[in-house]
Amino acid sequence: MFESLSERLSGVFDRLTKQGALSEDDVKTALREVRVALLEADVSLSVARDFIKAVQDKATGQTVTKSVTPGQQVVKIVHDELVYFLAGEEDPEKLKIDNPPAPILMVGLQGSGKTTTSAKLANRFKQKDGKKVLMASLDVNRPAAMEQLQILGSQIGVDTLPIVKGEDPLAIAKRAKTQASLGGYDIYILDTAGRLHIDQELIAQAAAVRDVANPRETLLVVDGLTGQDAVNVATEFDDKIGVTGVVLTRMDGDGRGLSLIHISEPTRRRGISYAVF
């Protein structure tokens, strides 16, 4: 993913003149090509525009360090700004998993990787933090969704809530809460159902589960190949449900995996952290 963007950016700065300070024309020439490279990588126009403006403001008029050329100076500024867009200035806060049992609600569209991510997250809590974790599938719509989580749980040695046919998502959430308390679990993860697109039924169901579980964290799982629509998905879920974090999956895909650039700055402005799986 990032290798493809790197290839697009290679050679962008060849035309910069060798002078002591960077003029606006020098910067504009290089950044015009950077913007094209971002747009070709499916980065949205608004995000590319904000990125270029931030770089231009920092680059124009800067005195070039003696040991580097103006082109190298601009490359460094672009690099630093790209790092900021992806990571921000501060380290992301740790997930709130104190005061057990701590509920974590997993939401997102169908096919984004919620179930697999739930298992990865549970395994991380178990292996790195020594936590006792319970997973529960609330997806009563997708065939074999509950069985999938059950299989993943057995593979990583994490307990899953026993399947009771005919239960609705709210009943499952309540049973998971009770089981987590009685079983001495540190964390319980609720894997909700997804849809191919955001609709009122999906949002209403997730909101109802949220009200029952009162989760410490509500994590939105987004497919890294979503591209420009990633921001719309994150905004919709945050407005209707309240999202505390975003998990991006399949980040080893093609150029559209640059959803990370799309989503990092808008979500950071909303106070939402994100992680990559």
Regions found by a protein language model. Give the residues of each.
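Primarily NTPase-proximal linker/entry elements flanking Walker-type ATP/GTP-binding cores
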Residues: 5-138, 145-192
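Conserved beta-strand/loop subsegment of P-loop NTPase cores
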Residues: 134, 188-190, 215-222, 241-252, ...
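Short, ordered loop/turn segments at secondary-structure junctions
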Residues: 138-141, 164-168, 192-195, 223-226, ...
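Conserved ATPase-coupling elements of RecA-like P-loop NTPase cores
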Residues: 145-146, 197-203, 230-232, 257
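GTPase G-domain guanine-specificity segment
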Residues: 201, 233-235, 239, 251-260, ...
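Inter-motif core of Ras-like GTPase G domains
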Residues: 203-224
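Active-site/ligand-binding-proximal alpha/beta "capping" segment
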Residues: 210, 230-248
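Single conserved hydrophobic/aromatic residue that forms the stacking wall/gate
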Residues: 261-277
